[in-house]
Amino acid sequence: MFVYNLNLYKNETLMKKKYNYQILVVILTLFLGLTKRVYAQQSVSFNSPVNTKTRPVELQLKKTYELEKAGVSASNEFDGARLSDFILENDSTATVIIKPENSPINNSGYYAFKTWSSSPKPFYFTFHYPKGYKHRYIPKLKINNNWTAIDPTFIYRKDSIVTIKLNLSKDPILVAAQEIQSSTDVKNWYTNVVAGKEYVTVKSAGNSVLGKNIPVLDIYKGDKKNKKIIVLLTRQHPPETTGYYAFQSFLETILDDSELSDVFLKTYRIIAFPIANPDGVDLGHWRHNYGGIDLNRDWSVYNQPEIKQIVKFITTASEDDEGDIILGLDFHSTTKDVFYTNKKRDNTSMPNFIDYWFAGLERNIPGYKVNESSGNSQEPVSKGWFLYGHNAVGITYEIGDATPKEDIVIRGQVSAKEMMKILVYIIKP
């Protein structure tokens, strides 16, 4: 009897050890998986850190302003609007007050409002900005659903003060710093572009501060395992629609089902973010998100949910599918066409890509000369994140505020084709 109990005890002890071992294996597996996920969002160091903790923003009062004495109205009651106040100066002129969401802030004095009158008349609008800021954008007009730049003879400048003349009627005219491309407009565009293309999956990186979707287009043919990754970004800064148009043209070219595109997408994977800052876009912000931060300074510690979730999506895709991130293109707008590049290229994913790419642009766009500004990123911007975080090529692709749309389309098309040619035929995976 005693021997039987001893054997039973030994068996129970062995079973407990085996059970404890299995638990240990499960714990280690979970820990390693968690470690991997934490690693995916590790911060990237920059020489000049920027405080990107949330700051308050000033929301504009959404309303229709009625100047009864003049019979003129103006409204900011639509997505992408920016009108802080509307004040009658005399029977033919009103002051348009434009304030940013907070400050300090880049001089990107964005405005957008609808205006109309009770009877046909010419009327003048004088723009007023806070001290230290001045008028940047040539007004664009949306009349009968068509956008056009204002007639230059209807713009009057006195020192830094800008006044415009509009011929008003009961039919509203939409006046904006740049053509409006709200989050709804962006969704309508990419939904139409990817329709019928089974190799494109529309996903979500997460939600903005206000709960708006941050869409992602995941693009590849065949198995995504081990495919090298190219990341495309735009609309970190709300008013920068000319950069967004280049992004559109670039992506549409990749999705044009050409022979080149087919070979490219069987070899590489595109992860594209068509609107990184949906809150800022729809609120008519000059530059920041609803957290009051320039998102293109948050690529180090990811204090803002938009960048945190974009980074998580990119790095998780790279790790889960064992695909190296080799190139990041971030589409923006500024006062002129320019490519901001990193000086460091040796020992990166593609040391010669930029030289090949720029040569291809100049060779295939008549009369075009690349404007490059090269410098390793000191502040936490996306192009620096690609370099310092992934040893990848990072480029900020800037289009001028007033670059004609037909030129933007051509540059987007050619730059996409040249990228695909280089990656398929010259720099092979």
Where is each model-derived feature located?
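Extended acidic/polar, glycine-enriched regions
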Residues: Y156-E198
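Bacterial Sec-dependent N-terminal signal peptides
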Residues: M1-S45
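Active-site-adjacent mobile loop/cap segments within catalytic or ligand-binding domains
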Residues: I180, N296, D337-T348, S373-P429
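Extreme N-terminal flexible tails
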Residues: Q41-S169
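Active-site/substrate-binding loop(s) of hydrolase catalytic cores
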Residues: Y199-P215, I219-Y220, K224-R363, G367, ...
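Short secondary-structure junctions
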Residues: A149-T153, E198-S204, P366-N376
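Short, hydrophobic/aromatic beta-strand segments
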Residues: F123-T126, L174, K187, Y244
